């Protein structure tokens, strides 16, 4: 089976690179087309992976103009449209190109719906909503990273007359976590937290979307309830204003950008991972934290919500209400050993091998005429 991946974020996202690599190991011949603004400081990681400078930073404001430039670049780079399937990794920007390929060459396509599709295109770019529905209706399959995003899209933006037909084409497949974390699972058992001491950790950009200010207010609420709480922050500083605010709190320690080996050690000396983001397609850091026995606090209705049954490895919270964050942290702390044990047990579902198997099975079902028997044999191995 030969699959064309259209992914505008391919070289900026290890997630998509890992997915392509994992499915290639399962017998899929993958070709990647990634339209980019610049290649400065960037290198394509593998064979049959094409990054093409064909758009500029202003094109994002002119959807149809950008789409035309992208399609022309695709046809120039890959003139022979001999694929069994197209996988568009962003429903609007990549899916619109896939729709055109289908109409011109008859090649079916899958689309993945992510945070940008829902919280930018559907929510803000109202004039493009009908095009979004068109892309979904003609897709052979619709992939969501979480059931929470599927529910959000169908509840808010899918017209009633299309819901049943579109729902039948949907599939929920999570992202996988880097093998490093699965090869270094924490083996120590969790103990009861002593003296109401709680060590929180966050890893990611220091920016508004990650909602560190609500985390700080939740810490204040916990202190009022008698907890001795601290927070370690690791990651890139995007907002200097926010950085100055969090580091002015004596309970917060900023440790900079850490390699994964050092981040692992930070996780192992912490109790709970907290990230009540406003918007999150998935949040790989949650899964990484789980591998080290850290229960997690995540936002209701965002990418990690519903990945696991509520209350299994943590709780969802209202990102606008610090009291819900404080209560979630307290609930976890009061039954900490059980949450820690379940956190480690749950991370197997984020193994890239398991994720790739789901994708190969889906590819086989929606791509008529492909060599499905050979691919199916690889899946069963």
Predicted regions and their residues:
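Conserved acidic donor-binding segment of nucleotide-sugar-dependent glycosyltransferases
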Residues: 310-322, 330-334
